[in-house]
Structure formats: C-alpha cells, structure tokens
Design a protein with these regions (language model features):
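Sequence/structural signature of beta-propeller modules
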Residues: 266-273
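Short loop/turn segments that connect beta-strands within beta-propeller blades
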Residues: 25-29, 65-69, 105-109, 146-150, ...
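Repeat-blade elements of multi-bladed beta-propeller folds
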Residues: 1-22, 35-62, 75-102, 115-143, ...
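A short beta-strand motif characteristic of beta-propeller blades
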Residues: 30-35, 70-75, 110-115, 150-155, ...
Length: 273
C-alpha cells in the first residue's frame, strides 16, 4: 500500500496497489465493501460529502460515492497519476505524469482548466490563499497558479521536487532532491530562505507552532524557525513525513520505525514598548 488511509466518520478508506478501494470499520477492521478500479492506486483518498476523489496509474481520475457504493464519474487524463487530489471551492486539483495540473468540477468531472508545468507531477498540490502550488519532480520546480488557471510564478531548484508543499503564514515550504528545504513567499514566489538538510528531501514538510519540519533520505529530521530558517532541532532518525500528534509531540516516520519526540519551540519575538 503506497497511499495513506483516510478516516471518514466510523470508517477507514484504504487505496491499494492491487487496484481496490476498501472501506473498513474503524473499530474492528471488518470490510464493509471493496470497489475494484483495476489499476494500482498510489493516490491517497480525498473525501468530501461522502465522495472519494483520487487518481490511478491507468491515468484516470475517479469520484467514488462511498455511501451508495457506486462510481459518480471518471475522467481520462491519458497519463499515469500518483498525485493525490486537493479540493478547494468548486474544484478538484490533481497532477499527472504528463506534466499537467488538472482542475475538474467535483460534481461531474468536467474540465475547468488544464495547465502545463515543467515535468511530471508526483506530489499533491496545495491550495491556499487563492493559489494552487504544484510540485514537479522531473521539472525540479514549484509552480503557482491562480485558482482560475493563470500561472503566477515558478521557483526552480537543483533537484527533483517530489515533496508536496505546506503553506503557513503566507509562505510555502517544500523540499527538493538537492538536499534543501525552501521557504517561498506565496505572493510573488520570492525565495525567503533555503536550508541545507542533506540527502534528498522527498517527504512533505509539516509546520507546527511556527516550526517547519522536514526529513531526508540521510535519515535525519530538521526543525527550523518557519520565519527565519534558523535550525531549532536536529533528530538523527526519521526520513519521510513528520506529523504532529497534539502540537507538543511529533511522530517522525523512518523507513521501518515510528518515533515520538517533543516538538521544538520557536523563540518569541520581543514586544516593542
């Protein structure tokens, strides 16, 4: 299983590389139903109003009604999809290996707009502040579009951008295979700082209480002040996605282990008198 499961009420939605969507009882793990797509699903569930939106390796985007257990619509992109969907307003946003970002109507799957980026889209777009931030792996870049499809800016890096971006405080954070964590202003795309983490930063960063965390293939986690990039924490384990449990503790994912550590604290800015 390559996709993260999703909790929906008392159910757990799981996408499988065997081409099945499974809905399980949260309490017991009992299978409620399984729906066969027939293609590996690396895209994680994105569920709104009982409908699961996702893509598959066969190049299709699906909307599956989990309550009625039937397919609402299918859109054929023609290119492999590993990206998860992002929903915002009246759009489903998802990237494909054809180097495109798709904006589809949630109710019908009809195209709102399609735009090209520099290369394959492996990660999930982030939508915030009226903008869609799209990582490109082979394009080695992050591109911002308006929700209407106008390209606003692009930031190039020295390596693949597999990482899905995180947005906090008017800034966009993402990692690159050049070993750096980037902080970019959401408006205008100006690079505010770059932090060398080492290895390849392939996992999505997470921002907790003003501290941005990123892991790398060098098996280390770094926590930095989200505003300045100053390093506040170095943890010699972990590799992929840092997740906040309660704002005070972090769950850090390694290759085969899960670590729980105390979250770093960002220094308070002195008040002016």
């Amino acid at each position: 299983m390559a996709a993260s499961p999703a909790i929906v009420g008392d159910a757990l939605v799981v996408h499988g590389m065997d081409g099945y969507v499974r809905v399980l009882e949260r309490s017991s793990g009992r299978l409620r139903f399984a729906y066969r797509i027939g293609s590996p699903i690396e895209s994680s569930p994105m569920v709104r109003d009982g409908v699961d939106y996702f893509g598959a390796w066969n190049g299709n985007v699906y909307a599956l009604d989990l309550r009625r257990r039937r397919l609402v619509w299918r859109f054929r992109s023609g290119h492999k999809i590993t990206s998860s969907a992002a929903l915002a307003g009246r759009s489903v946003y998802i990237g494909d290996y054809g180097g495109r970002i798709l904006s589809l109507w949630p109710g019908s799957g009809r195209v709102r707009w399609i735009r090209r980026v520099d290369g394959r889209v492996y990660g999930t777009p982030a939508v915030a502040r009226g903008r869609v931030f799209v990582p490109s792996s082979t394009g080695r870049s992050l591109t911002a579009f308006s929700t209407g499809g106008r390209r606003l800016w692009r930031v190039r890096t020295g390596g693949y951008v597999y990482s899905s971006p995180a947005v906090w405080g008017g800034r966009v954070y993402f990692g690159s295979y050049d070993g750096r964590l980037y902080a970019v202003r959401a408006r205008g795309g100006r690079v505010l700082w770059r932090l060398r983490v080492g290895g390849h930063v392939s996992g999505a960063p997470a921002v907790v209480a003003g501290v941005v965390y990123a892991g790398s293939t060098a098996e280390r986690i770094v926590g930095a002040d989200a505003r300045t990039g100053r390093v506040l924490l170095r943890f010699p384990h972990g590799q992929y996605v840092p997740v906040s449990g309660n704002g005070r503790r972090l769950l850090l994912h390694g290759y085969s282990r899960l670590y729980a550590v105390e979250a770093a604290r960002r220094p308070r800015t002195p008040r002016r008198r």
